[in-house]
Design a protein with these regions (language model features):
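Alpha/beta-hydrolase-fold enzymes
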Residues: 1-81
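Catalytic active-site module of serine/aspartate enzymes centered on a nucleophile-bearing elbow/loop
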Residues: 136-197
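Short, conserved loop/helix-junction motifs that constitute active-site signature segments
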Residues: 12-13, 99-103, 129-133
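Short beta-strand/loop motif that positions the catalytic acidic residue
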Residues: 102, 108-110, 114
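Active-site nucleophile elbow and catalytic-triad environment of alpha/beta-hydrolase enzymes
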Residues: 80-98
């Protein structure tokens, strides 16, 4: 997603398709005032302060064994500086704004139980996608999916859908997650149509 936003110094790659799993598009335009204000103040007054998500009571996956392993992994970042979070939000701003430029074949996946990226930013991102050609776009909504869709307990279902889309993008997904995606993703009056329905 970084390369596709144009924010990277890396040239935008010539790719056959783009797969976005729970895309990080929670940019400032979709945030409430309080988080935006807290980030603005924090990056100016305490940019080096580190924060953890321990007290947030957010569950990124239903795969508890995997989450416990990540908690013990020394290679996983467990505390993040405020200035790093600020940079991440800048990147999410760019990602949210990049939807209108994504004319590659696209597969967007999102879990109904995602507690990291709210549904509204995903809806806004999907709503900005080019209206045509809709046949090159597939949206998938996983009723039992969390943020870490590929590592969730039903991750094999998601992986099978990814494999199906890579091999035959126009075919319906084996899980059927594309059949309910339209109602879950799109706003009333959206110009975007959903392929595979």
């Amino acid at each position: 997603m970084v390369a596709l936003t144009g924010e990277s110094s890396t040239p935008i790659p010539d790719v056959d398709g783009v797969i976005l799993t729970a895309p990080a598009v929670w940019g400032r335009p979709t945030m409430d005032l309080l988080p935006r204000l807290a980030l603005w103040v924090g990056v100016r007054l305490m940019p080096g302060l580190t924060l953890t998500g321990r007290r947030l009571k957010i569950q990124p996956s239903d795969n508890i064994a995997m989450l416990r392993a990540l908690a013990q992994d020394p290679m996983v970042i467990h505390a993040t500086r405020i200035d790093t979070i600020y940079g991440l939000v800048n990147l999410m701003d760019a990602a949210l704004a990049s939807g209108a430029r994504l004319d590659n074949p696209l597969f967007v996946m999102y879990g109904a139980k995602d507690e990291i990226i709210p549904r509204e930013p995903i809806r806004r991102f999907v709503d900005t996608l080019p209206a045509e050609p809709s046949r090159r776009r597939k949206l998938a909504w996983y009723e039992n999916g969390y943020h870490m869709l590929l590592r969730d307990l039903e991750g094999r279902v998601v992986i099978a859908d990814v494999a199906s889309w890579v091999l035959t993008p126009s075919a319906p997904l084996p899980s059927g997650a594309d059949r309910t995606a339209g109602e879950a993703f799109l706003r009333a009056g959206s110009q975007v149509t959903v392929a595979g329905r």
